[in-house]
Structure formats: C-alpha cells, structure tokens
UniProtKB/Swiss-Prot annotation:
Record organism: Candida glabrata (strain ATCC 2001 / BCRC 20586 / JCM 3761 / NBRC 0622 / NRRL Y-65 / CBS 138)
Stretches that traverse the bilayer: none
Molecular functions (GO terms): molecular adaptor activity; protein kinase activator activity; SNARE binding
Protein's UniProt name: Autophagy-related protein 17
Source taxon at top rank: Eukaryota
Keyword hit for Cytoplasm: yes
Protein's cellular compartments: Cytoplasm; Preautophagosomal structure membrane
One GO term of the biological process aspect: autophagy of mitochondrion
Length: 409
C-alpha cells in the first residue's frame, strides 16, 4: 500500500509541477507586458508634458515676449520707427538750418561774392535724408511682420494648443490617466492578483511535495515503532483521499488565471493600438512645432535687416553731429579770419606810414645835403683836381636809394 500511495503522490506532484510551470511562465510574461505598458504610459505622459512646455515656450517666450514685445513693440515700432526716426529728423533739421546759415553768409574776401556754403561738400549732409526716405519702405515691412506674427500666434494658440494639444491631453487622460479604474487595474490590482496567484501555486506545490515526502518515508519504513508508522499512514491516507479535490482546485485556479491573463492581454492589445494612435498624433504635433519653430527664422532675418538699418542710421546721425559741429566751427573760423584780415590790413597801413615818414625825413636830409654840396663845390671845386677823389667830388646824386614793397591786403 505505501508503494501505491507514493506512486500516486509522485504522479500528482509531477502533473501539478508541469501545470504550475506553464501558468507561471504566462504570469511572468504578462507581468513583463504590464511593466512595459506602465513604462510606455509614463513615456507618453512625459511626451505630452514636454509638448505642453514646448508649445508654452513657443507661444509665450519665443513669440509673445521675444518677437512681440522685444522686437515688434519695443525695438521696431518704438525704438526704430519713433525714437530713431525722431532723432534723424532732429539732426537733419539742424544740419539744414546750419547749411542755410552758411548759405546766407557772403565771403567778402573774394570778388565773385560766393557764400560760405560754396566751400563745403553738402553731400554728406544729406545722408539722413536718404535714411528718412527708406523709412516708408521699412514701415510696411514691419506692419507685414506684425500681421504674420498675429497670424502665427493665433495658429499656435488655436490649432496647436487649444485643438491638437488639448485633444492629445484628453485622449491621454481618457485612455492612460492615473485616475482611470482601468489604469489602477493594470498597474496595481492585476500585478497584486498575479503575485497572490503565484503564492497560491507555490502553496499547492509545497503541499503536494510535503505529501510526497511523507509517502516516501512510509515506503522506506524508517520508524522506531509501529505507532509512529500507523500515525503517519493515517495522515497520508487522509491526504491521499483529498488529492483529486486538490488537483481539481489547482486546475480551477489555473483556468481562472489563464482567463485573467487572456483578459489582460486583450486590454493590453487595445492599449497598444491606442498608444500607436496617440503616438501618431504626438509625432504630428511635434512636426508642427518644428515647422513653426523654423518659421521664426523669418523674424530673425527681418530682425537682422532692421538691425543693420538701425546701425547705419546711428552711424549717419553721428556723422551729421560731427558735420554740424564742423560747420559751426567753420563759420566761427571765418569770422576770426575776417578779424585776421583787418589786423593784417592795419599792420600794412602802419608799415606804409613808417615808410612814408622815412621817405620824408630822407628827402629833407637829401635837400640839405644838396645845398651843402653845392656850397662846397662853389668854394673849393676849382682848386681840387678830379683825380684826388675820382667821380665823387662833383657828384650830386642822392646818398640813399629806398626800394620797398608793402603787400596790399
């Protein structure tokens, strides 16, 4: 009898082990699928969050702050079209008034009556006029950019954020959200149930193994007395009578487990299809974000052109300021030149007066000298041979010769 009990215990244990091994393999596989699904769900949530932040950055930072406020409202509409234009007009008007002033001042130092404006180049004084003439060209460009900006903001808000992103968030919340009963079922309940089933299967195997070990002990007959043997035989016989029920419960448990696993696979297959569809919508929105981000290059190109225009205007304003100062100094220097002319003329007249006085004194001395020479010759000339002072005794030519030139101013 112990031999038959042991054989029956061995056969039941082997059958149970095979059945449990198969279902445990399926449990391990479905657990992996559940774990992977949870990772995919977190990945989807991360992608949705990234998209939300990216669109928020695109709308608020890149568009409204970076382009709307910083460029269009402040830099272009105010700094360039108002402040810069007003400063160019101010200095253009100033330089024109200075040129008009020079055009009114006649150069009295020359005979053709040219004005001071004739002696300077006026081409550089017109650089701001050329810049101001470009403003009507720049202004429509900025207005066009404003229109494009408004359109882009509207599209980002309505099409990308309000429509596509909202749709994606709604789909995620309705299919993968944390608050869903289905999500709790897949992330908490099912894994916990599968863990319980694994423990239950272990209990089945442990119970059958313990029964098999007792049968082997009876078969080997290693007992000190017959009472111990009889007691164990009684226990083993009672357990043997329950083997069919145990196997029936085990099979029911395995069938129930396989049914649960099949249901989980059905749900996961649906979730996989839902994930694929949602991934497609996410990728489509990412592509749209990339496209709109590339559109920002348009604003960058316009910003570069306007910045070059602004830098050129600032350089021309500085040039005009320097010209204004030069024209002012030019008129001042001309007035000082007139003073210098008067000084030279006065000096020339003074020099001429000195020469005239000198001539008068020399003539007086010469007249007196002529009288004295004539008197000397009348008294002594007949007694002096000419050879004693050849060519000089009876020479009445002046003792001086005065040759001068004073420049007329």
């Amino acid at each position: 009898m112990p031999e038959s009990l042991a054989e029956r215990a061995r056969s039941t244990l082997l059958k149970a082990q095979v059945l449990c091994r198969e279902v445990e393999s399926r449990i391990a596989e479905v657990k992996d699928r559940l774990s992977q699904w949870e990772k995919n769900r977190h990945t989807l949530r991360f992608l949705v969050s990234c998209l939300e932040h990216q669109l928020g950055f695109l709308e608020q930072c890149a568009l409204r702050q970076g382009i709307g406020r910083a460029l269009i409202e402040t830099e272009w509409s105010q700094v360039v079209l108002v402040d810069l234009v007003n400063e160019m007009k101010l200095w253009y008007d100033k330089i024109q008034l200075r040129l008009e002033r020079l055009d009114q001042v006649e150069n009295i130092l020359v005979a053709d009556n040219k004005h001071l404006s004739h002696y300077i180049s006026q081409e550089q004084a017109l650089v701001l006029k050329k810049r101001l003439d470009e403003v009507p060209i720049i202004r429509p460009q900025i207005e066009n950019i404003q229109t494009q900006y408004d359109t882009m903001c509207k599209r980002v808000r309505q099409k990308l954020i309000n429509k596509r992103l909202t749709e994606i968030k709604t789909i995620f919340d309705s299919q993968f959200g944390d608050e869903l009963t289905e999500t709790a079922e897949l992330t908490e309940v099912k894994p916990r149930d599968l863990d319980s089933i694994e423990l239950e299967l272990v209990d089945y195997i442990n119970s059958l193994t313990d029964h098999f070990d007792k049968c082997q002990a009876l078969e080997k007959g290693l007992f000190n007395d017959s009472n111990e043997y009889d007691e164990l035989l009684k226990i083993v016989s009672a357990d043997d009578s329950q083997l069919d029920d145990i196997m029936k419960h085990l099979l029911n448990t395995i069938d129930s487990t396989n049914h649960q696993i099949d249901k989980v696979y059905e749900i996961l297959d649906i979730k996989t299809k839902q994930k694929t569809i949602l991934h497609g919508k996410i990728n489509e929105l990412i592509a749209n974000c990339t496209k709109y981000s590339e559109y920002l290059a348009i604003f960058k190109g316009i910003a570069t052109s306007i910045e070059k225009f602004k830098e050129g205007c600032m350089q021309d304003i500085q040039l005009t300021k320097e010209l204004y100062k030069f024209y002012d100094e030019f008129e001042n220097s001309y007035n000082k030149l007139l003073q210098e002319v008067q000084r030279r003329r006065a000096l020339s007249q003074k020099m001429l007066g000195i020469i005239k006085n000198c001539e008068n004194e020399l003539k007086t001395l010469h007249d007196e000298d002529q009288k004295l020479r004539t008197h000397f010759l009348s008294e002594n000339g007949a007694f002096l041979p000419e050879t004693i002072w050849p060519g000089e005794i009876d020479d009445l030519s002046p003792l001086y010769a005065l040759d001068y030139h004073i420049k007329e101013i």
